[in-house]
Amino acid sequence: MKSNVEKFDEITGHIFAHLYLNFPVEMNFDYSRWGCEVDEDYWSDPNSDESRRKQRERDIIDATFRFLERSGYIIYTPTNGGYMNVTLTEKALLSLKRHPDSLTGSKTFGDVIAEAFKAGAQEKMKGAVGTVMTMAFSSITGGSL
């Protein structure tokens, strides 16, 4: 079972990949992207194991969106089934447009995250997301963690 931090990194990678590839167009994200939409099964038996699993996933997705907004990475409008008008902030775009020190060539963090997402390379995507978040935090704190 994945930890909440691993799920956060995957969800963040998914969000960043879509927003970076489509920037500046605002995107909509609903829970069905993660297989945890509220459907007829939920309403017929909200206490079933599957309904509870989907609710836990929605809680993590909601917390991820709130964290990314509060941290200044995204702007969005919440809806009952997800989020609409989601876009990257200037801070996020600048972070995603940076080039990793470990890479030679012209790929940016955004490119790495988007390519890893498309290829299903979860570990590579999570690593790039973690680096982007650390880099942005370090720039705010003057490089000290």
What is each residue range found by the language model?
Residues 51-70:
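Short amphipathic alpha-helical interaction segments
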Residues 83-116:
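Short, amphipathic alpha-helical interaction segments positioned at domain boundaries
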Residues 106-145:
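Membrane-inserting effector segments that mediate pore formation, membrane fusion
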